[in-house]
A protein has these predicted regions:
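Conserved Class I S-adenosyl-L-methionine
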Residues: 13-19, 57-59, 179-281
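Class I SAM-dependent methyltransferase Rossmann-like catalytic core
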Residues: 17-29
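Conserved alpha-helix/loop element of class I SAM-dependent methyltransferases that forms part
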Residues: 29-48, 63
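Class I SAM-dependent methyltransferase SAM/SAH-binding core
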Residues: 49-105, 128-129
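A short acidic, Gly/Pro-enriched loop at the edge of an enzyme's catalytic core
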Residues: 103-114
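A short SAM/SAH-binding and catalytic strip from SAM-dependent methyltransferases
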Residues: 113-127, 150
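Conserved catalytic/acceptor-binding region of the Class I
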Residues: 128-129, 135, 139-213, 229, ...
């Protein structure tokens, strides 16, 4: 296995983030749009070695292959199901995917030119440890980057859901990512990266359009059970789920053609590992 990986075999099949085919219509397609812009803004030199931590279905890895001109991309995720999905979806020989814990990455130190993570940090029990691991596996002078959704305001497809759910069920407010994940704010992300010893830390917004053909295209992914909002929707009795659907239909914006024009904002953070590269390193 490349780069001295010690593959872990933890199976996360029962995790709410374990089914790649259900994740794609809910978040995956929008994540790909953000990932492409995220990689472009990193402005990393070609022929580098990249690590994609919490690779999921491979959105960031594919963006790196498409635009980053890497020599190699290694993706790691705690979910064996996602790892298998990424392997099937991405056949590029420069990419490989392994199971691994973001808090104890299965890679040696200082092996990557770039280490990144997309839409993962806020779900981890110890984000600071994960960022420290990203820094550890990055070579001196290399780039570390991540992005998370702006759940509190700018991730509109989820924001409308929780506002509607909370109006019908006060319990839903406790599950709202905008409340649960204060990490997903610029000041918290900056402090997280600075605390890991990274230098030149910057945080910026990435906004992408998320247009749905009609309300059914917007609503159906919430029935896939992938992530907090869909998990909540599928936990409801049928009558209460129908009431939530009706309220959402009433509050989301509709264009004249029946489509639903929304946008999704992610906060992207990046920094460099201090120190200079060694010759030939």
């Amino acid at each position: 296995m490349p780069w001295g990986c010690a593959r872990q075999t933890q199976d996360m099949e029962g995790d709410a983030w374990a089914v790649g085919a259900a994740y794609e219509p809910y978040i995956g397609r929008w994540s790909r749009a953000v990932a492409a812009e995220f990689v472009r803004r990193l402005e990393v030199a070609p022929a580098g070695r990249w690590l994609d931590i919490g690779c999921g279905t491979g959105a960031v890895s594919q963006a790196v292959l498409d635009a980053g001109r890497p020599a190699e991309v290694a993706g790691a995720d705690a979910s064996e199901a996602y790892v298998r999905y990424a392997r099937r979806r991405i056949a590029d020989p420069r990419a490989h995917f392994v199971a691994g814990d973001a808090g104890a990455l299965p890679f040696p130190g200082a092996v990557a030119d770039v280490a990144v993570s997309g839409l993962v940090l806020n779900f981890l029990p110890d984000p600071a440890r994960a960022v420290a691991e990203l820094a550890r596996v990055t070579r001196p002078g290399g780039t570390v980057g991540a992005y998370v959704w702006d759940y509190a305001e700018g991730m509109q497809l989820i924001r409308y859901f929780w506002d509607a759910a909370g109006a019908l069920d006060p319990r839903a407010r406790e599950l709202d990512e905008g409340t649960r994940f204060p990490l997903c704010r610029p000041d918290r992300l900056r402090a997280l990266f600075t605390g890991a010893g990274l230098v030149g830390v910057r945080v910026e917004a990435i906004d992408v359009p998320t247009r749905f053909r009609d309300f059914d295209e917007y609503w159906t992914p919430f029935l896939g059970g992938q992530g907090p909002a869909p998990g909540y929707a599928m936990s409801l009795p049928q009558d209460r789920r129908a009431a939530l659907r009706m309220r959402l239909r009433a509050v989301v914006p509709h264009a004249a053609d029946g489509s639903i024009p929304l946008s999704a904002r992610a906060w992207a953070v990046r920094g460099r590992r201090g120190g200079a590269r060694t010759p030939g390193g």
